[in-house]
Every structure is written in structure tokens, then in C-alpha cells.
Regions:
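Active-site loop segments of alpha/beta catalytic cores
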Residues: 2-223
Length: 223
């Protein structure tokens, strides 16, 4: 948490985002080690050892809640919860190990810091509660989903974040600029934060990142 304090001293007026993996995603690394393509190891474990799995997920939820609270106390201005591997679950498993746990974490954090903005990232959203806006401020969308179509599934006060393909940022060029503007135009009259659909790739040239920022900040709709 000292790193957060030191970074905040340098950022001054710029917001700093804290983050953590969600319980299910954290558990996939804990149980599987090297992640299998279909998460067969952790899913098999959860079927055969439901009590142990419940204990692990509940424990991780409590630890993540405290970890995020510690980040807020160190100076972050908002938090993001990443549930990268939740898309491999069916509806009932998702409700038990993802949706309920994310709500639990959000409520725990909000109990102490009621005004802290919370962003949630997943690759699947049809399993989220209809009252998601009661505990999340923003939903981060991956590159395989249309932002415009996804917006229809949420109430108007939910912010969406995303969703340029990270590989496109790594490639750069005019097509990247075209796709950035396409996303911006599509989401113009909505609560929206431009971002990638997943993490930035290691091979991404820094000049491409500068170009992305420049394009977003200078964007104006053509009348």
C-alpha cells in the first residue's frame, strides 16, 4: 500500500484506480495453477468438494474486501474488480461464485466508503442481477461484445467501460484510429469510459498508446 501512497503524491489531480481479482478468478489460479482452457480442474473440484469450495470463495471474498478497503485508505479514488474467468461458469455456478460474491464485496466496501465508485470487469453479463446499478457504478466490457447492444441490458445510470481490442492497439495505424472513433460515436450520449477490452499487451508500442489518448481526447462528433 506504500506504492499507492507514493503514486498519489505524484498524480495530484489525477484519479488512481485500485483493483483486485474477483474470488472465482483468484480461485482459478489458486486451484489450477496453470489455467486449463475450460477450467475443468476448478469446476470438477467445486462439484466434488462443494463445502471446501464455498469456504475458499467466502474466504477470498472477505480478504478481497479488506484488500480493497486498504487500497482506498492508502489513497485510490475508485476500485475495479476483475472476474476474467467467470465466463466459463453456467448460470447457477455464476450466481453462487461470482454474482453474489461481487455484490458481497461491493456492499462490504460501501459499508465503510459509501461513495467510492466501483467498476466490474467480466466476459459475461447476462447472468448479472437486474439491480446491478445498486452496487456497481460501471461495467467494463471485453472486445467481443458490442457496447451499444450491451447497454440495452443495463439501466441508464450504469456507466460502461471498454472495449478496443488490445491487439488492435498493439498494431496501431489508421484502422486503430477508425475503430476508436467508431466506439466513441457509438457511445457518445451514454455514461462511458473509453478503455481496452482487456489488459494492454506487452508488445504494444508506447507511441500507439499516445495516439489512442490523443484520438480520444480530441474526438468531436461530425455534424
Amino acid at each position: 500500500y506504500e506504492a499507492i501512497k507514493n503514486i498519489k503524491k505524484e498524480l495530484t489531480e489525477k484519479p488512481l484506480i485500485g483493483f483486485s481479482a474477483a474470488p472465482w478468478t483468484l480461485a482459478t489460479y489458486y486451484i489450477e495453477g496453470n489455467i486449463t482452457k475450460d477450467l475443468s480442474i476448478i469446476k470438477s473440484f467445486s462439484y466434488k468438494n462443494s463445502k471446501e469450495m464455498d469456504f475458499i470463495i467466502d474466504l477470498f471474498s472477505d480478504l478481497i474486501s479488506q484488500h480493497l478497503i486498504n487500497q482506498i485508505e492508502a489513497g485510490v479514488d475508485l476500485i475495479q474488480i476483475f472476474d476474467t474467468h467467470s465466463y466459463q461458469m453456467d448460470y447457477y455456478m455464476h450466481q453462487k461464485y461470482s454474482t453474489r460474491q461481487v455484490k458481497k464485496i461491493a456492499n462490504s466496501v460501501r459499508k465503510k466508503y459509501p461513495n467510492i465508485p466501483i467498476i466490474y470487469y467480466s466476459k459475461i453479463f447476462q447472468f448479472l442481477d437486474k439491480d446491478v446499478n445498486n452496487y456497481l457504478n460501471c461495467v467494463s466490457i471485453n472486445s467481443n461484445i458490442s457496447l451499444k447492444e450491451q447497454k440495452k441490458h443495463f439501466k441508464s445510470d450504469i456507466c460502461l467501460q471498454g472495449n478496443l481490442d488490445p491487439l488492435l492497439l498493439a498494431e496501431g495505424g489508421e484502422y486503430m484510429v477508425k475503430e476508436i472513433k467508431k466506439i466513441l460515436l457509438e457511445m457518445e450520449n451514454n455514461f462511458f469510459i473509453f478503455n481496452l477490452g482487456h489488459g494492454i499487451l506487452p508488445q504494444t508500442p508506447v507511441e500507439n498508446v499516445f495516439k489512442l489518448v490523443e484520438t480520444v481526447r480530441s474526438f468531436k462528433k461530425k455534424v
